Amino acid sequence: MTSWTKRLAGAMAALALSVGIAAATEIRIVNEADYGGARAEAVVSSLMQPINPFVAGQAGNTTSIAQIGTGHSVNSSIEGHSSASLIAQEGTRNRAVQAIEGSNSALLLVQSGTSNNVLQASRGDNNFQLVGVSGSNNDVGYVQVGNNLAGVLDVRNSHNTTVVAFQTNQSRNFLMPTGISGLNNVAVVIVPGKMYVLPKR
């Protein structure tokens, strides 16, 4: 994973943790059962089916970027084989970073709205991410470290919200947190086994 990706991931983690410290008395903890388990596995597995041909075997890598609107910024980096980086953006001043270090993995982003920032990073093999973002002034980071990890983040219709998800082999293999779309002025931190929802001050 490149140094700029590490710096961006660190910055987003620091932002989320600083919000958590400021609002520590108002933390809402959601158990793993609320966003993992059989339902997440069924939904995420069905979403993975269309991209399976791009991430099978020893094929080359695939990068696809589509942008409509004004002032968008995209960075995509793949180290490995048979991986796919797919980004679709529309709106104004949206920024996206995708980085894959490993093989047979896929990162997908569908983003619209205004002034949203998304970081997706995967280190390992056979990983999958799908992120949807709309609204304005949202910061979203999804970092996977491990193998055979898959998940979906739905942060649509949100405003001034920070969502940071860390998925490892200590997490369940399938991650699909619910209740993080349509949020306003909150920070959500997802770590193995827990999800913290914190109001921004």
Model features per residue range: what roles?
Residues A14, A40-E41, S73, A84, ...:
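Intrinsically disordered, low-complexity, compositionally biased regions/tails
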Residues T25-A99, S103-L108:
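N-terminal targeting and processing segments
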Residues G10-V19:
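Bacterial N-terminal signal peptides
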Residues Q58-G60, G69-G71, G80-S82, E90-R93, ...:
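Parallel beta-helix/beta-solenoid
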